[in-house]
Regions:
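Active-site-proximal cap/lid insertion segments
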Residues: 27-37, 60, 83, 91, ...
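Short aromatic-enriched loop/helix-cap "lid" or pocket-rim segments at secondary-structure transitions
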Residues: 57, 66-67, 149-151, 184-188
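Short alpha-helical segments and helix-capping/turn motifs at coil-helix boundaries
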Residues: 122-123, 154-163
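Hydrophobic alpha-helical packing residues
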Residues: 45, 126-129
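Active-site segment of extracytoplasmic enzymes that catalyze sulfate/phosphate-ester chemistry
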Residues: 19, 26-120, 134
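Loop/turn elements at helix/coil->beta-strand transitions in domains of secreted/extracellular proteins
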Residues: 13-18, 48-53, 130-136, 168-172
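Bacterial Sec-dependent N-terminal signal peptides
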Residues: 1-15
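Short, well-structured beta-strand/strand-turn elements
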Residues: 132-146
Length: 211
């Protein structure tokens, strides 16, 4: 779904752009022809938006995909296609524990992880937006497989917001919601389901097992 926060602009104006991202979500939504989930707010947003029905990911895992989004490059062309690289790529800092600071190989040996060093010519597209006058904010996930340069964002963090820009300055603002992230799957396991699992259509590559 593509939605501009300024629907009617002249050719001489720079539109404000609000970019909302969610994670680990499939196109099982009504705007794509699926009626499993009831999502009236998303339906309303979709009715006012341009919907892409023929778009495909460059790689089927989060961080390499995110590196592609922020640079406009194929991950294999800039070395960000391996999942996962170093601890320094995380927006929440470099915490020291095996899940992030080291990888464990098949022999049980600890292998220090690394941050990809992209070619000098590769830039985050927000660097171009900032150069053209945009106020760019990210709230708040980066995780690009490489450390985001300081020139990528005017603000990057949990408090980042377009409201801090100069008067009449156009903005590009990202808000990342992780409520659909796979890691949140079990947070509500004791609550009633909102969808009957028996009514969820299975794609042909998912076997319909007894469990």
């Amino acid at each position: 779904i593509y939605f501009l926060s300024t629907p009617f602009i002249s050719l001489s104006q720079k539109p404000n752009i609000l970019w909302i991202t969610v994670e680990d979500i499939s196109p099982t939504l009504s705007m794509y022809g699926d009626s499993t989930a009831i999502t009236p707010n998303l339906d309303k947003l979709a009715s006012e938006s341009l919907i892409f029905t023929e778009s495909f990911t460059t790689v089927g895992v989060c961080s390499p995909s995110r590196s592609s989004l922020i640079t406009g490059m194929y991950p294999v062309s800039i070395g960000t296609h391996q999942m996962r690289t170093g601890k320094d790529v995380f927006s929440w800092g470099s915490r020291e524990y095996d899940g992030i600071s080291n990888a464990i190989d098949v022999n049980g040996d600890s292998i220090p992880l690394h941050s990809v060093v992209t070619p000098p010519s590769v830039k985050c597209f927000t660097e171009y937006l900032r150069a053209s006058g945009y106020y760019c904010t990210n709230n708040s996930k980066t995780d690009y497989q490489f450390a985001a340069p300081v020139t990528a964002w005017d603000e990057n963090g949990n408090d980042a917001h377009w409201s801090n820009r100069e008067v009449n300055q156009p903005f590009f603002s990202v808000f990342n919601f992780d409520v659909t992230h796979e890691s949140k799957m079990w947070l509500h396991r004791d609550k009633p389901l909102t969808v009957d699992p028996k009514k969820v259509p299975l794609p042909p590559y998912f076997p319909d097992t007894e469990t």
